[in-house]
Amino acid sequence: MTLSFLKYTCCQRDFLCPCSRLPCPPADAAKKLCDRKSGIGAEGLLLFSENDPQGISLTCYAPDGCQTPAPREAILIGAKFLYDTAVINLTEFCLSADGNPHRLHLETRGGEAWGVTLDLGYPRMDAGIWSSTRAGLLRHQPYPRENPRHRLTLVGFDTPYLFLTGDDTPPADVASLIGEFPAGATAALLDPKADPLSPRLLAVSGETDFTHLACAAATAVTICGERDFGVPLAVSLSDGNRYVTVTPALRIYVTLEVKESIRGEMNL
């Protein structure tokens, strides 16, 4: 039996969305469709149900046929699929995944959606993650009002981050600070000449997820803006077609581009 489908890509991750009823169990369909040698090839198969009391729910199946938690990219792809196929005609709605509702907003140009914004809620910041006395002192160090952008800011999420917004800090000092951080810490240099409302990342030490890094960076700048300028700032960072915005209340929104890559059919 033939199954029609759409394949989407978001941040180099691809997922398949069936456009018709599956002719076989979801596990079997995922194995056949997601196989990159004999099938279409994808990281997962997304199925939707309208029986959830919270609205439409999404379930993700891995290429091995097992049900798996839906990653962020799968949720955004699911939202664009529902909009593209007119299952949902709203640009703002909730989509449940793994029992959790997610607030989504479709970003459109000329009536067509190019990306999806996901409400990530509020950051988890825990001052207790800093094991270094020096790092702890730097976090609470006062900054001169006459030059508020030459500062050092430490913000902790799931991973410790160090953000430098002054251009007068020698690279050796940055390296020594990173050495005092807990394992897995990341350092980033923010452009001191950029608009405080639109900070720009110049360099990053260590591998990290852009969204996590941008969330931490934007939050750091937002906190500094309220402290140094006396008013809370809404801050955005971008990297190509990926955007992160932190509101003055420190609520985080991430916008990622979602592209349709394949529209086709396959016999199952």
Task: Annotate each language-model stretch with its function.
Residues 115:
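Glycine-enriched loop-and-adjacent helix/strand subsegments that border the catalytic/binding cleft
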